[in-house]
Amino acid sequence: MKTRAVRLYGESDLRLEEFDMGELKDDEILMELITDSVCMSTYKESIQGAKHQRVNDDISEHPIIVGHECAGIIREVGAKWKDKYQVGTKYTMQPAINIKGSMAAIGYSYEYCGGAATFIKVPPIVMEKDCLLPFDENSAFFEASLAEPMSCIIGAFHSMYHLSLIHISEPTRQAEI
């Protein structure tokens, strides 16, 4: 299976390439990507290359596909996942897989899985950690691509629980931190 993708080879070394990903394995899923949002952390990753904490050390020999805020359609399902995932279904991914002892993440660590591609092979760890997430058939792909950054915003608001509001009627009162 061929794909066209933006791959990272090193510091400030991004290349748009068409390449073969090989045959789909029984524990993988093939997705056609429709959208990928651009994130500042992808920019940071492209500048730092292998110095980035989530990027593999050997990207000059095994480049990774950048991008992690993506959504697409399942086009082929490996035998292991046929009971859980169906061809033609719309999905997005949670990029931070949270593997104990590892910083691996979609768009930073995988040779055939990242958002800036036409097709990707989703590695088994994504399904094992329930990080391949379906979304409503009536929702736009861009909405699913924005799920991860939106969760960051919501998380930031929730983390502000320790702050109280400054009351307009009491102009001398300071916010409690």
Indicate where each model-derived feature is located.
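Extreme N-terminal starter segment of soluble prokaryotic enzymes
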Residues: 2-4
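Short cysteine clusters
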Residues: 39
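Glycine-rich beta-strand-centered segment in the early N-terminal region that forms part
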Residues: 22-36, 51-100, 114, 136
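Extracellular beta-rich ligand/substrate-recognition surface
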Residues: 7-13
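NAD(P)H dinucleotide-binding glycine-rich loop of Rossmann-like/cofactor-binding domains
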Residues: 97-165
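Short Gly/aromatic-enriched secondary-structure transition segments
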Residues: 44-52
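Single conserved hydrophobic/aromatic residue that forms the stacking wall/gate
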Residues: 166-177
